[in-house]
Amino acid sequence: PTELLFNAAAEEEYMEDPQETEKIEEALLAQGYFSLAVPMPYEWQDYMRTYCEEYGCPYPLALAVAQTESNFDMDAVGASGEVGIMQLNPGPGSSYHAEIQAATGLDPTTTSGNIAGGCYKLGLYLAKYGNVEKAAMAYNMGEGGARSAWDSGITSTDYSKAVKEAMETWECTVNAWGGV
């Protein structure tokens, strides 16, 4: 007998119902989990909320970095090869991407992996350095560059100020729609 490799009838049972998906999204939007104010698809908002919680990164901080780094553009590529919505630098021989992949279990060049990697780094730096401006500086300059700046008496940069300002705006936006 011939073995079926694909059973279309069985597959239809497990396919998502678009109407059901829409109802779930509407309910999550009504509850404040998703927001029309966030210029990302709901799936990406879900990734960001999930990874923020997992890695100890405030959701408004992750939104602020995504806005500042790429204006929420997953296809963005920076001058030094940074990629994705969170503009993750691959590092020498892709060593930074390897570190992120080892920590998160996800490929940082995919949307979920890029968001996870950014949230991981932000949560790590926030826990390590204790405030948003220092965490933003380490995220943007690397830890060595940030330490060098701090040793020279520089405690903030235009980038860290922009992130902090955007974070404060996102905090107001998030609180306004109950999406804490």
Describe these PLM feature segments:
Residues P1-F6, Q19:
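N-terminal secretion targeting segments of exported proteins
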Residues E13-F72, S112-G113, V174:
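Export/targeting segments at the very N-terminus of extracytoplasmic proteins
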Residues T50, Q67, P90, Y120-A127:
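Short glycine/serine- and small hydrophobic-enriched flexible loop segments
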Residues C57-M74, L88, I115-C119, A135-G142:
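Short, functionally critical alpha-helical segments immediately adjacent to catalytic or ligand/cofactor-binding
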Residues D75-G78, A149:
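Short, solvent-exposed loop/turn and secondary-structure capping segments
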Residues A79-A102, G117-Y120, S160-V163:
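Substrate-binding/active-site groove segments that recognize
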Residues A103-N114:
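A short, structured beta-strand-centered segment in the mid-to-C-terminal lobe
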Residues A127-V180:
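Catalytic and substrate-binding regions of cell-wall glycan-acting enzymes that process beta-1,4-linked
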